[in-house]
């Protein structure tokens, strides 16, 4: 330590002067809690500054330190602090022996679904009222794609317009989430929506954001498409430094981890309409292996373009009547929908220790793939039977003990019978006549939320 730098305040003052002199900041622009990147420091600048600090402090300073401690205050505190004891660098890790079967507690939930649904209680009331949120696509959604030509107008007129849509998807409080208006404008609204609903889920769990900083909290977010990224990049003159992160699928999870300063896994999951359930599965596994001590699992889906509607129309998948009739002889296809759902998960023993409200318990889950079936998009009955058996085995639950299943239930003439047969093969055998298996499908109320479909059923 040099004589001129004896405290954090001294180093903060030196860093401010350095930024003003070498990076071009004005003193008024330098916020001690703003990231160095936001203050204009590039990777090349970081290399130069690390050399200056190494000479100044008489110890090695790496450019990586600026990313691990990204603000002036954080960097100064790190560089002035005594060297840590190597044995205390990492917290003691939980033994995983015997933990792989530990139940997982659901301690918080949040959701935003069509029909004015802004939380789990509102969803339950919506279902009890036997309501449906399905309607016509808002006119402004497809205006961008109508170039005025007769050909395009004819194509749009022949495209299914039924869906389940959220209102005000362009509304976002960027200041609350510490995002500039310019960056927010380039963000996929799915990123914005997930930030909002995740915050609500943490509030529902009674967890403050400050308590999560630098914690081993994982984020697992299901999403399928970033139509916004494709739309926003069609005009090259409007592409800027925020465009890549604004439209990247990986950032849907990473954005939340960044905002809350979470240090656990941060994974975007795309397995089509199972995305959010696979996200929950991965979150549970992460908790059981102690990669995370708390996990946020989510799914989000918005419908911004007529292109996917048209693609589904070409194979006759969408309902021309605008009804998602699950397990109904009159089923004529599914209805696409929007929404977001988030659950906060914790090991049951930890939740009980901490006095958390336990809303539900996940005892087991399983994931597989159809493999070679009757076409790339065709379900495989044998694979469905196998994944059900594995899930109940992992949960140590006899199938005959199950009295209700929230199904996929898309309302398609092929998918629903295959799912019903698989359920019957696994859950129907050996069942007493006075112990029927009840099934349901939230898609009849909300439509098929695709990447958020599984978590909508889970929250129900």
Language model regions located:
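Interdomain regulatory linker/hinge segments that flank or connect interaction modules
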Residues: 1-2, 333
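Phosphopantetheine-dependent thiolation modules in NRPS/PKS and related acyl-activating systems
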Residues: 2-94
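Internal signal-anchor transmembrane helix that establishes type II topology
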Residues: 96-100
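Condensing-enzyme catalytic core of the thiolase-fold
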Residues: 101-460
